[in-house]
Amino acid sequence: IPAEELRGMIERTGFAMAVADVRFYLNGLMLEVRADGIRCAATDGHRMAYCGASGDVLRSIIIPRKAVLEMSRMIDSGDVQISISDRGVRVTCGASVATCRLIDGRFPNYEQMAVRPDTIAICNRQELIDGLRRASVLSNEKYRGVKLEISHGAIAITSGNAENDASSEVVDATQCTDLTAAWKVDYLLDA
């Protein structure tokens, strides 16, 4: 697999790996070998990310978090060779080789949990990030929640705290379908 492709997949999914969860199978990155390529997925029980090929699953493994972070550091350019055995995985990129044991467990059925997008709003990514950051300044320090109201060509972002301080931001959007939902702002910013 091209190094840039694997590194990109790790960057798009690695943030969702659990750190020290008692459900040990969440403390890593699930890598599936599929008929048309590979797919990566990760979840910490609150958020989930996956990307890659969509063909039939031929093999599925869970690589520990520390090994994934080390792999992403060693991958630079060229091609990456991934060798999988029953108990471990070896990743080779140029002169660098990393070997680790696999996590023995069953990764959650992420495809069943995935939300199909029936509500869509298209906006400028940086404007949304900036609006989320500004609105979250006055959010509850413990929960850091923001409310998004999507409608009529705009995304309204609001937050508040126990002292009745409130913040509101509006981001222009297109192709909006109405939706009102509350989110932990950190999860939105990570995505």
Residue map of PLM features:
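DNA polymerase processivity clamps
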Residues: 1-103, 116-191
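Specificity-determining recognition surfaces
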Residues: 109-110
